[in-house]
Curated annotation (Swiss-Prot):
Taxonomic lineage from the root: Eukaryota, Fungi, Dikarya, Ascomycota, Saccharomycotina
Entry-linked PANTHER family: TEX2 PROTEIN-RELATED
Membrane disposition: Single-pass type I membrane protein
Lumenal compartment segments: 1-109
Transmembrane segments: 110-130
Role played: Component of the ERMES/MDM complex, which serves as a molecular tether to connect the endoplasmic reticulum (ER) and mitochondria. Components of this complex are involved in the control of mitochondrial shape and protein biogenesis, and function in nonvesicular lipid trafficking between the ER and mitochondria. The MDM12-MMM1 subcomplex functions in the major beta-barrel assembly pathway that is responsible for biogenesis of all outer membrane beta-barrel proteins, and acts in a late step after the SAM complex.
Protein name, per record: Maintenance of mitochondrial morphology protein 1
Family note: Belongs to the MMM1 family.
Entry note about domains: The SMP-LTD domain is a barrel-like domain that can bind various types of glycerophospholipids in its interior and mediate their transfer between two adjacent bilayers.
Biological process according to GO: lipid transport; mitochondrial genome maintenance; protein insertion into mitochondrial outer membrane
Length: 447
């Protein structure tokens, strides 16, 4: 393959040769003498000129090809540099954005953390340090300021705003949400009972009765502790003697002073069984109650002695000694226990002031069914020399009075209310188990 420069050079040479041949033929026709001059002078000039022209054209082609290659190389290098620069700019942009984002995130976290600490400090200072304390009331002029204060003028330890704020924090479950404001009080209690039964997996209609063996053990330990304290410190005897001394002014004139001669608090324990949970009657399924069968076979005895005074025709004319011992040997009943509020019942006594002071909070309500069984053993001894022992009429009279007292207080439809203490943990109720080191330190202190 010939290059384009070589091809043009060959064509040009052929054209010159043809021209030269034509001129030679023309000149040879004109004159034969000028041929030598042409060969010696004119032909070298023509060849030199032809060589120079071909050399210039070849150099020009070489320069053009070199310039084209240089331009292409420059173009390729510029494109490559542009692409590399674009990649570098993109990488640098992404890195700068990442660094800016990380710095901004750190700044946000720092600012939010500082603000949260400031808010907590403001809350603590406002609601716990600068809250309204109890207002000290001054007594009248000239009078002594006693330790007693009128509770009506003492503000609560927490301010009203604090109490509202704390009450807004304590929330109940989802069932006590916005719908509770629309429901009535009856529907609310009914839904609460159903929620408790559902979440404790207890079906009132199908659940089988329980034996309460574990509860019998706890009750036995409690009663045993009570008996030990009574035997060691004579608490029951002192309490009864103090009660009799306070009531001595109310005794009839024909009775002398009463003295306690016997006190037996038993040695057995009650057995509770057949516990079942059911809806309270006449409550429209708004309150639950527990029915428990109780059985006690023991001897609970109280013995007293006194004198029957004969004040006619003059005071203390004669005195008839009387000794009585009343024992409960058997008690069977169905115990009803439930938790309720004081608003659901009314007091039976006329003194409603004490009831109003205790109104509020939750109460443990218990009562016994009318089909109870209470067996007594009454022993009586009347007289000094000729004594009458175990008179049936006296036994039946005492038994009827005790049952009457029991029915008026503890048998349905009457109930006994016991106010439950607050179950919230308090520091004054906190205790820990005593160790050997504590015993040694206490003994050394006593010595």
């Amino acid at each position: 393959m010939k290059s384009p420069n070589e091809t043009s050079f060959t064509n040009h040479t052929l054209e010159n040769a043809s021209t030269f041949g034509a001129d030679l033929s023309i000149e040879s026709n004109e004159s034969l003498v000028s041929l030598d001059e042409y060969l010696s002078n004119t032909l070298p000039l023509h060849l030199q000129q032809l060589f120079l022209e071909n050399l210039q054209k070849r150099q020009q082609g070489i320069l053009e090809s070199a310039s084209d290659s240089i331009i292409e190389a420059v173009r390729d290098s510029s494109q490559q540099k542009f692409q590399n620069g674009l990649h570098l700019s993109l990488d640098s942009g992404v890195g700068s954005k990442g660094s800016v984002f990380s710095a901004w995130s750190f700044a946000q976290g720092l600012v939010i953390g500082q603000l949260s600490v400031i808010v907590v400090l403001i809350f603590f200072i406002k609601f716990f340090i600068f809250s309204e304390g109890p207002i000290k009331t001054e007594g009248p002029k000239g009078g002594k300021s006693g330790p007693k204060r009128d509770s009506a003028y003492v503000s609560p330890l927490l301010s009203t705003s604090t109490s509202h704020f704390l009450s807004s924090i304590i929330k109940r479950g989802e069932s006590d949400g916005a719908d509770s404001s629309e429901n009535t009080d009856t529907d609310r209690k009914f839904s609460q009972i159903n929620t408790i039964l559902e979440k404790t997996y207890y079906n009132v209609e199908t659940h089988s009765p329980e034996t309460l063996d574990w509860f019998n053990v706890l009750i036995g330990q409690t009663i045993q502790q009570f008996r030990e304290e009574a035997l060691q410190k004579d608490n029951i005897v002192h309490s009864l003697n103090n009660f009799i001394a306070r009531k001595s002014g109310e005794l009839p004139q024909y009775l002398d002073t009463i003295k306690i001669t016997e006190l037996d608090i038993g040695e057995d324990f009650p057995i509770l069984s057949n516990c079942r949970i059911q809806y309270s009657p006449n409550s429209n399924k708004q309150r639950l109650e527990a029915k428990i069968d109780i059985d006690l076979s023991d001897r609970l005895a109280l013995g007293i002695e006194t004198k029957l005074l004969v004040n006619y025709p003059k005071p203390f004319t004669a005195a008839l000694p009387i000794q009585l011992t009343v024992s409960i040997v058997r008690f069977q009943a169905c115990l009803t226990v439930s938790l309720t509020t004081a608003e659901e019942f009314v007091p039976t006594s006329e003194n409603e002031a004490s009831y109003g002071s205790e109104n509020g909070g939750y109460f443990l309500m218990f009562s016994f069914s009318p089909e109870y069984r209470m067996e007594f053993d009454v022993k009586s001894l009347i007289g000094a020399r000729s004594k009458l022992q175990d008179i049936p009429k006296i036994g039946s009279l005492i038994e009827s009075q005790i049952k009457k007292w029991f029915v008026e207080r503890c048998v349905e439809p009457r109930f006994q209310f016991i106010k439950l203490p607050s179950l919230w943990p308090r520091s004054k109720n906190t205790r820990e188990e005593k160790t050997e080191n504590d015993d040694i330190s206490m003994k050394s202190t006593d010595l």
